[in-house]
């Protein structure tokens, strides 16, 4: 073995070996399963640190359970990522001078599949470097043939239960991507903008009402003014009419409980392009009129501004209203604006025909399950409350997307008639042009990836899956949808437990992103430090629900631990191996291994990986390296030490798979993944070994404190206890000491009194230091006496300061007497 840990030597082709040997191919039938369906990364780019963290957690848990005797399944998959992939492919085509509109739908889809294959190969290479134990015989793609059958079947089953409908409703519209998006794909951000205070004159009156709005561009779609029915200031105006500032038409004043009396003047203009406004219009039977088109431009409702960009038109409309006396004032405010998570474009609210999932019944089913004993266990627990709150206020889900790449909606149209089925009903029937929301297809992955609705072999063995590991940021996007979809189709929960981790941030707490330039490529880290080092740096700083502040120091710490394990293994491997029974030191060490294993088992159940990391670090640096290895240096036989090392390697394997596999193969000529988690005997705490260690620690501390060279033999004895010659021999060898009866200098430790004969060299040094101290004390006494005999000081200084100087002088004199007596 090399003198220094070389991760490239250790990790080279190791995952390839695991795959070839089929260590992680899950049997179709099992009585003791542990299964995880891995969150599918998008086929739009490379894996980032967050993907690596997630994959490492899953992999470590699967390896741990395999060593515990479970049949394990870690199922890999990738997501077609509808909007994101289509954008990437369009950008790629644009570089070649090709527009999407230049291609037929089938041609564009082929381009998308080609992109997917190219990207998937990159992702698989990255998984290989990470060392993830996927069962590639069962890999899935959210748009593969089986997935298409499953998604269509799911849609049809929802339709048959009247849980899917097509309706003309206010939806979130991404004007850049030209598609509808769901509510949770809208991200609110604080934006500085203008608040316009508009005058609405009462019919046949010089009196006016002031209405505050940030969206002056929607004024042409105003159909009413609304006040809160509890607002006494305006209640007498309900039913009256006001003059529209722009069109000069009359619009009515209504009362609605959704109006906030605290916002602006407490009067709200009811117009298109707001979900709340649409709800009020429906309730009061008011006709809605869009004034903004699909591209974010003003339409024909106001010919004067037709074709103008919605935001540019704000100033034009404001100037016109100011000129005509309808603008009271303008203020600058900070308010939340909805942005598309996909394109980062400001979302527009448009009324459009779309496909929706009715969520009331599905939400009630999920909440009911959360109230049962069979509910999914969330780690940390507070995310269950978050999920419950979200479902208590949920809206219907917009599932249609105006894209080409994705699952086609299984609906066929002919004139005004439509049919919901997978295959075409016949001649003249045209399939709906839209595709389904990506989360609609990934929302059934918990059971569809296991074969539903065509093959139930894996479902019988591995469903519900044991665990889902994912980031808390997709709790509502993905976890929630798998939950209610599984309850609807399978009549049971999709997984037993959900472990939610946080986000990876930089060392000052910022989210890693391309725009900030603070992102780190996991493959570059692996190239420099190795996969095991990156795994450690992420997993051993991981707690449920918590973010990680990542920095290079974490990598250095992890690499040092790997190097320490390497050095321990190399030392033990070089020892003689003739048979020998374990001595007290070996049994003491075995007990320490038992304690380590117990701590890992305890904390892995709670997914407290940071605690496991601390326990492993303390064990390796403390018990194994500084204690056990030091103690066995007094002998040359490593027969039992090798047995202990083998157990430690198996215990550490889930967290350091490459290194432990290499060492097991190199030293023991065995495959670590063919082993079982070792049974370790528990012994009573071996007090004799603890006593030896206590003496060694204190003698070493004494030597370090006074910087006594190892060339000088430290003479000592234990006053209040007896040690055997063999025990004294161990202490002597590890402290460069010698037993000598004396009572010169007595050190009291936790359990002992150690008498040390002070070396002559130290006495000389100590005498020199004492003489210097005496000289210093005399000069300080002289200074203090001079101050206290100074009349000016005594007359002007505060009493407290004078008393302080006198106290100081007394202490200096006492100290001088002490040193002069010595």
UniProtKB/Swiss-Prot annotation:
Q: Name one GO molecular function term.
A: aminoacyl-tRNA deacylase activity
Q: Record's CDD domains? A: Anticodon_Ia_Val, ValRS_core
Q: Which residues bind ATP?
A: 514
Keyword list (alphabetical) reads: Aminoacyl-tRNA synthetase, ATP-binding, Coiled coil, Cytoplasm, Ligase, Nucleotide-binding, Protein biosynthesis
Q: For this protein, what is the EC number?
A: 6.1.1.9
List the record's Gene Ontology CC terms alphabetically.
Answer: cytosol
Q: Where is this motif: 'HIGH' region?
A: 41-51
Which Cys pairs does UniProt list as disulfide-bonded? Answer: none
Q: For this chain's UniProt record, which GO biological process terms are given? A: valyl-tRNA aminoacylation
Q: What does this protein do?
A: Catalyzes the attachment of valine to tRNA(Val). As ValRS can inadvertently accommodate and process structurally similar amino acids such as threonine, to avoid such errors, it has a 'posttransfer' editing activity that hydrolyzes mischarged Thr-tRNA(Val) in a tRNA-dependent manner.
What free text does the record give on domains? ValRS has two distinct active sites: one for aminoacylation and one for editing. The misactivated threonine is translocated from the active site to the editing site.
The record's annotation in PANTHER family points to:
VALINE--TRNA LIGASE, CHLOROPLASTIC_MITOCHONDRIAL 2, VALYL-TRNA SYNTHETASES
Q: What protein name applies here?
A: Valine--tRNA ligase
Native organism: Mesomycoplasma hyopneumoniae (strain J / ATCC 25934 / NCTC 10110)
From which lineage does this chain's organism come? Bacteria, Bacillati, Mycoplasmatota, Mycoplasmoidales, Metamycoplasmataceae
